[in-house]
Amino acid sequence: MTAAAALLVAVAFDLACGEPPAAVHPVVWMGSAIQALKRAAPAGGRAAELLFGALMALAVPCFFAALGAGVAALLAPHPVLALALSGLLLKPTFALRALRDAAYGVRDALEAGDVTGARGALRSLCSRDPSELDEPALVAASVESVAENASDSFVAPLFYFALFGLPGALFYRAVNTLDAMVGYHGRYEYLGKASARLDDALNFVPARLTALLLLAAGWLRGADARRGLAVLLRDGGLTESPNAGRPMAAMAGLLRVELEKRGHYRLGDPVEPLRRGLIDEACRIVVLATLLFAGLAAALLAAVSFGLGQELFR
């Protein structure tokens, strides 16, 4: 029961307060550790970089998972304290309010007619170069990022919390942070390869689960769920990432729009124009989808805690 309550406490804290200060934010600590390891990485030599990168991909997540396990063990005899602290420690592994607020930053700038400001705000959502994006492209990039990050920033960490507790959520967040910092082409091609592959593996189920949650939330909000499913099945595998395209394609279908990253992919069909109000609707669908998942996960954790899980799966 403590795990279910801690999950709900963490979600409530996120929606009410947002992100904790950087000094006490575990993801900031992860970033600092990764930055130090990047500086210590061997210079040159693919084999050396691959080996060092593989060690990074295991050492950093395992270290933070071990910290989570240690905290959980210390708190086990104290249920009330465990509830409060577990919720506070779980919160930094996901970021729903920050995701929504970043998207609203793009929307607000567009509503003010400030395309340059919207391009700057988009940098908080994704790593794409926004310098040449016009308003429709900024809307598309925002909608894509909100949909994709519904998985990375919310569903995935809570999925691993439900399976493995606080250590699971911290392990996932460390892997995802590694992928963000070194798991891309270019300078860190070989250093980040293991992190990128591990991130792909960990996100395989959550990304597809997120797409289904978006369809359910979209249906509840009166969006075109039938088209959402069709576009998910048709276009979900068109992105370079094996996972990112699933929630993005579902969202494209729900909103009846085409989401394009020029030179890379096109998801959905241009039935409706890319207007700035779609950022609001995408955020509403994502918030509803993630809250549905949080409620479902909490209910399952509570059921298992009360011993109902054994009866259900006997």
Swiss-Prot record:
Its membrane topology: Multi-pass membrane protein
UniProt keyword annotations, A-Z: Cell membrane, Cobalamin biosynthesis, Membrane, Transmembrane, Transmembrane helix
Gene Ontology cellular-component annotations: plasma membrane
Tree of life domain: Bacteria
Subcellular location(s) per record: Cell membrane
Keyword Cell membrane: yes
Pfam families: CobD_Cbib (PF03186)
InterPro entries membership: Cobalamin_biosynth_CobD/CbiB
BP GO annotations: cobalamin biosynthetic process
Transmembrane portions of the chain: 55-75, 152-172, 200-220, 285-305
Any GO MF annotation of the entry: ABC-type vitamin B12 transporter activity
Leader peptide range in chain numbering: none
Function: Converts cobyric acid to cobinamide by the addition of aminopropanol on the F carboxylic group.
Family, similarity comment: Belongs to the CobD/CbiB family.
Name this protein carries in UniProt: Cobalamin biosynthesis protein CobD
Native organism: Sorangium cellulosum (strain So ce56)
